[in-house]
Amino acid sequence: MHMLKAGAALTPALYLLSHLGVGNPGSSILQAILLLPLMGAVCLIFLPSSAQDTHKSIALLTSLITFVLSLFLWVLFDHHTPEFQFVTEFHTLMRTSGTPISFGVDGVSLLLILLTCVLVSICLLLGWDQGAMGESVSRDTKVSGLQTRGTGSGVTTLNNLKAYYVSLLVLQTLLIAVFTVLDLLLFYIFFEGVLVPMYFIIGIWGSRERKITAAYMFFLYTLFGSLFMLLAILMVYFQTGSTDIHTLYLSEISKSRQLILWLAFFFSFAVKVPMIPLHLWLPEAHVEAPTSGSVMLAGILLKLGAYGFLRYSIPVLPYASSYFAPMVWVLSVLAILYASLSCLRQIDLKKIVAYSSVAHMGFVTLGLFGNAPEGALFLMLSHGVVSSALFVCVGQLYERHKTRLLTYYGGIVQVMPVFSSIFFLFTLGNLSMPCTSNFVGEFMVLLHTYNTNKVCGTLAATGMVLGGGYSIWMYNRVVFGTRPKVEFISHFADLDRREFCSLLPLIFLLFWMGIYPQAFINVFHASVAHLCMPS
């Protein structure tokens, strides 16, 4: 019944989208993918706050339809050409020059759009039981004289529930726009616009008292870094007379100016990755964010910086990218080793996964500037799957036991065997076991890096070994042991059907990408080759 009401509420939006086409079915689909999440958010805003079941249905239905449409783009996509496809123009949104705003898809952006749609749908499914009677599904519990407040995803009031879904759908819209817009200035606007819904997700629905501080750190760190990019965009415009991506790819910028512009872009993108030493905001943001916030942060937002390097820094500023490549190698290796060693001394599960993300993104930046861009992009996608799944698993533990500290766990396999099995699969992915997706990406990066610089390749391989160490250590501390460390752990049930279904797509992707990576590499091979070897 609620799904029927949701469909009825979305009918005007779907009717409008059906009349946006310009003759090309791919362009029509791309327009729908861009606008449908935003229209779903608008529908939610005008619904009464008490209609919480309808809110959930509209949000999930909107996200699922967007995902299905993105699959149609994959089917229609021609992976043999590096050119942008399904180019669509919004003539009603005119820039000062009178040129319509253009959006398009290549092999790089297509897979990131698919990943975004998958993760948003999973986030909405994770929060499906939130908001009942104004509380989280994990309501206040008293066990062994210890009272704990159930926060779950932090959705505590009916108004907050609606705002939560609106924030996720707006975030999805902005992320898709970042990956498809064909203008540098608009890329910056959407790039920064992502901060707003993510700030609210962390600051309002975070799980602890320091969530406001974490939200401020996330917002200010990334905003300050992006100011350099704004100055660089102004310099590019005065140099080339345009911010259109096709014009930039054909422009010749002097070597001295390339060095300045590259550094400005670097600070902005490095904060988002994040690279050492600009990573301090990430562990704090992950620890305080709700599960859905951590999933989106690790799965997609960390990819924005690497995407910026691949989309703009390398093709537009090739000389500077080559000039500063050794510096990036050093910073990447430092990130891999430092973050991996930091994982071994953490006792908070979220911090372990957060520092693990810093290490894996170190492999990504190493590959981007170490002649392994395809491996770097593949690892970006894989990390989006594995890290998101690990944060979901940590969130499922937290919803039951109200703690993320390793010292309180042990013997979980006795009471949660299904969870322990799934957690084991993603632990294998995190330590880059063969036949999992991370192994393919990291092996490609290490192979090309070693051929480029043997010292960096060897040190990075050491980080891969450390990754296996902290992953096995974490899993052993949580799952095995003679009995649970805290008595009340034994009172909680294993995963329910909804929780299992939310992880099922990620399990499928983990092994599909690991066993048959060519299905994904074929999609972006031509595009990556074009970006890294501009004519």
Identify what each model region corresponds to.
Residues H2-I29, I45-V166:
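Transmembrane helix-loop-helix hairpins at membrane boundaries of multipass inner-membrane proteins
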Residues P37, D106, D183-I201, V271-P318, ...:
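Functional transmembrane alpha-helices
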Residues D78-P100, E135-V137, S207, K211-T213, ...:
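Juxtamembrane/interfacial segments at transmembrane-helix boundaries in multi-pass membrane proteins
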